[in-house]
Regions:
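Flexible, active-site-adjacent loop/turn segments at secondary-structure boundaries
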Residues: 47-50, 67, 106-110, 115, ...
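Active-site-proximal, glycine-rich beta->alpha crossover segments in alpha/beta enzymes
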Residues: 1-93
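Short beta-strand segments at enzyme active-site cores
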Residues: 41-44, 97-106, 138-143, 212-216
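General structural feature for long, well-ordered alpha-helical segments within catalytic domains
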Residues: 19-22, 26, 30, 79, ...
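Alpha/beta enzyme core
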Residues: 57-104, 114-138, 150-159, 204-208
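Glycine-rich, proline-tolerant flexible connector loops at the mouths of alpha/beta enzymes
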Residues: 1-16, 45, 99-118, 217, ...
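Alpha-helix-loop-beta-strand connector modules within alpha/beta enzyme cores
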Residues: 8-39, 114-139, 174-178
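Catalytic-face loop-and-helix region of soluble metabolic enzyme cores
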Residues: 130-228
């Protein structure tokens, strides 16, 4: 349905924080656990663009629906700025409660054409990255399926980049100088252990001369065997 800009603009910080309080409480409790002593704890936020996509379409987003929304460029930019404001508060509160790294997920960056990336992905994410850096905290970005990770890193300047499984890791290893995370296709976890080991070792070999955090290129699929 239509998005009520006045309703979004009138949301006060107290109401916003009340809904997120369980997250901050969980972060604080995790930090108290002796097992995480001297270890980093990653706080997570969705990027403004991805949050907007879910506001337009709550289920799995359809590119056609998003395209229909592009007609009102003013509305999009206005909502992104409002989301950016509240995300900065959310980031600050995660850090206050113990997060030592922030990761920004832009799960639907890949929906956009190249010409739309500067306004809807690069600029809003850069503003968040600069805010996190001003708090002296490292920041990881995950612009899923953006294809041009090199340009993203040059413009947004995260401390590390999370890659998806649709990009060739060999190209990334040549193009990107900052630490890299992820890349493994979650579907590999649905295969046998031999295939999983082979794929994992391939990533480790490709990034053997590069700062690399082994991880999936997106979330664990619901049907994945936890014992895999």
């Amino acid at each position: 349905g239509p998005i009520d800009l006045d309703k979004i603009s009138s949301v006060d910080e107290i109401s916003f924080l009340k809904k997120l309080f369980p997250i901050y409480k969980t972060i604080k409790n995790v930090k108290k656990n002796p097992l995480v002593k001297n270890k980093d704890l990653i706080g997570f936020v969705g990027a403004p663009w991805t949050l907007l996509v879910y506001m337009i379409n709550k289920s799995s987003p359809k590119k056609k629906l998003i395209k229909n929304f592009f007609g009102d460029n003013y509305l999009i930019k206005k909502i992104l700025k409002i989301l950016e404001k509240f995300l900065k508060i959310h980031i600050e509160n995660q850090i206050k409660n113990g997060a030592t790294i922030i990761q920004i997920f832009d799960s639907w960056a890949g929906l956009l054409d190249k010409k739309d990336l500067p306004n809807y992905v690069y600029t809003p994410t850069l503003n968040l990255v600069n805010h996190v850096k001003s708090l002296k905290i490292p920041v990881i970005c995950f612009p899923r399926e953006i294809k041009d990770y090199k340009s993203f890193c040059e413009i947004v300047k995260p401390d590390a980049i999370n890659i998806d499984y649709n990009i060739d890791p060999k190209i990334i290893a040549k193009q990107i100088k900052i630490p890299i995370q992820g890349g493994l296709d979650p579907k590999v976890l649905l295969s046998d252990k031999y295939t999983l080991k082979k794929k994992a070792l391939n990533y480790l070999d490709i990034f053997k001369n590069h700062p690399y955090v082994f991880n999936l290129g997106h979330g664990v699929l619901p049907e994945t065997n936890p014992m895999m």
